[in-house]
């Protein structure tokens, strides 16, 4: 049975990733371990140019670091649970975990605990993806002797 490490968060549920799951299952017995890095929910507006420039913000209304982290974990958990349910509906053997916010750390942990035949990294498109901006695919290829497939969601 081939074991696949799938690393994704915001792209879980996307058609491109679903197509890869179906392809791997069609090749033969497959087991998927899905890691959803708990990307911090740091969606705060930092450029107020449209409003005439920066303006003072009352710090008491900003989320705390713990709130940002907790929201990121909750989003990753919801995405992961939805994807695992989808995979089970397809008849796949699948499980997973919410991982470290740093995707490389999450991958290292998974590989330290289990053996995989392939890593499937699912990202947002270039220009939006922080993972691509961090050169994550090349870093993974350099560090691990495991085939890597990069799945990029459309714009």
List each language-model region with its residue ranges.
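Small/aliphatic-rich secondary-structure junction motif
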Residues: 2-64, 153
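Residues at the starts of beta-strands that form the adenosine-phosphate
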Residues: 3, 29-33, 93, 118, ...
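Short, surface-exposed alpha-helical segments at coil->helix boundaries
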Residues: 73-81, 134-137
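Structural beta-alpha unit
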Residues: 88-117
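Glycine-rich, Arg-bearing micro-motifs that act as flexible, cationic patches
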Residues: 122-139
């Amino acid at each position: 049975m081939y074991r696949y490490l799938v690393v994704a968060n915001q792209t879980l549920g996307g058609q491109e990733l679903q197509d890869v799951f179906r392809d791997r299952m069609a090749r033969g017995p497959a087991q998927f371990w899905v890691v959803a890095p708990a990307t911090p929910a740091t969606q705060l507006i930092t450029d107020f140019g449209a409003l005439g420039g920066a303006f003072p913000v009352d710090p008491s209304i900003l989320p705390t670091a713990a709130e940002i982290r907790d929201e990121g974990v909750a989003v990753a958990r919801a995405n992961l649970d939805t994807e695992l349910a989808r995979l089970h509906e397809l008849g796949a053997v699948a499980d997973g975990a919410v991982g470290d916010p740093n995707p490389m750390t999450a991958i290292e942990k998974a590989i330290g605990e289990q053996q995989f035949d392939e890593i499937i990294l699912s990202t947002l498109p270039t220009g939006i993806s922080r993972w691509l901006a961090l050169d994550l695919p090349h870093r993974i290829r350099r560090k691990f002797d495991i085939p890597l497939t990069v799945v990029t969601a459309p714009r």
